[in-house]
Amino acid sequence: MQPTQADRPYSYETFPTAGNVAYFSMEIAINPSMPTYSGGLGVLAGDTLRSAADLGVPLAAFTLAHRKGYFQQHLSGAGDQTEDVQPWNPADFCTEEPARVTVSIEDRTVTVRAWRYDMVGRYGHVVPIYLLDTDVDGNSEWDRGLTDHLYGGDTNYRLQQEIVLGMGGARMAGTLGFPINVYHMNEGHAALLTLALLESQLGGGPLGAFNEADIAQVRRKCVFTTHTPVPAGHDRFSAEQAGRMLGADRTARLEKLGCFHEGLLNMTLVALRFSRYANGVALQHGKVSRAMFPEFPIDSITNGVHAPTWVSEPVQQMLDTHLPAWRRDNLYMRNAIDLPEQAMIEAHARAKEALLTEVATRTGRVLDPHVLTLGFARRAATYKRATLLFTDPDRLLKIAEQAGGLQILYAGKAHPQDEPGKALIHSVIEKAQTLSSELLRIVYLENYAWDLGALLTAGVDVWVNTPRRPYEASGTSGMKAALNGVPSLSILDGWWIEGCLEGVTGWAIEDGADDAAEAGSLYDKLEKAVVPRYKSAPEQWARMMRSTLAFNGSYFNTNRMVKQYTRNAYYPVQLLEPAHVEEPSFAG
């Protein structure tokens, strides 16, 4: 549906003194044809920018060009993953900016340019995305490849990329002709932008000349979002690496400012020490982060997803008919609780048909649209426990018999250097081949990416998530499923602690002493709750889909999330100039 003037959301013109926001992220899912993301962090960043464009937030984003992409996944019949690069040309999608900036790496001067991609919102507001690129004439062959690979190479390569993103990005932002009042670091990869801001604050003078007022000026401009729930997950570099890459003076100043922990430069500490506001990405993750970093006040803003991107075409058509304001303000989806049950059933059936058609096209496997279908698709990391469903094969087969058939769809990539992750994929495919029968059909789909993810989250009947607590900071795939009325069956971690209404939006897998105990709870929920309702109570199932969309779809979206960032992080009341208000007079 085409928006009208009356559809416009509230305007950020109510913040006339706030200025522009610069958003920094190592990866951003910008466009399905641009392989500039690897997983959840990048998809979240892309959805954040899409909602910022829809809402008219004065924001520009900075990331790396990643000319070689992430990777194309290939799976052998035995389940072994191999990878191909995904080369692409920024000139095919973006406009080159004339500006050039330089950064110093190991005493080398590296030139950085930027490619601009315009993210256009629903009402025409543009959020420009600047992709930083070191493939510039005059740079050495090595330096020209610094921005090529997303999460490629060793820790030396990673630190050099973080210098380009943080310091190069901050300098590029300063050359583009619009004032930046807020710098948002989406994870610690961009933390070194604070160092560039401090150097700018000192006017090029020696770092040793800074004082508390200088640090306060940098801190006033910076906000930080952490996505990491365990200490080992934070980017850390040795003092030797830091000194060699950044220089001895910068490294000494960072150490003096308390940015080292256990002898390592900790990028999360850099970001926290220079930020006036920090947040985790779910309520529970905020608690975990405050426990890890007790000296810092860390808020919580729960993640979301961009509803128009992830709602399937059939569900969009249903919402356009019954709740036409849902795109303007996702909170209107709360009224999905009154949708006709048959409309929900028919919309999901069409989404499921589209998914199973894609499965047949990719694999030749013909699945039954009337059979209960579970979905499990995410990065192949061991803590996500993709094989938990196979803990007791005999019990899983009995559940398939009870259901009159069960279909399980898997997808997910392992990082090229993650051998345990690759072994996990191999194990899932091996078990799928062993267990598959007429009643139990298990398919692992190759090359999980944006388009396949959208089909899966919309088309399965139940979304399964089995992370080991507390490793799931938030998770967003279940939110995409909820926007399509698909309930979750999940461990209570991350966002699901907030989103689970037992039997209403899905089911919780109970905490157990070990994997076997939690697998037992998973089987219990399938046997006693999921299968009976799906098989014998279709009206109850339709009401649950409707409730899932109404309660979780209306809240776990980036429309709500970006509004929270603007109010709590970007433009908090105490930073705005107070408006003059005339005192009321009650004189007669």
Annotate each predicted stretch with a short phrase.
Residues 1-588:
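Catalytic cores of carbohydrate-active enzymes across secretory and cytosolic contexts
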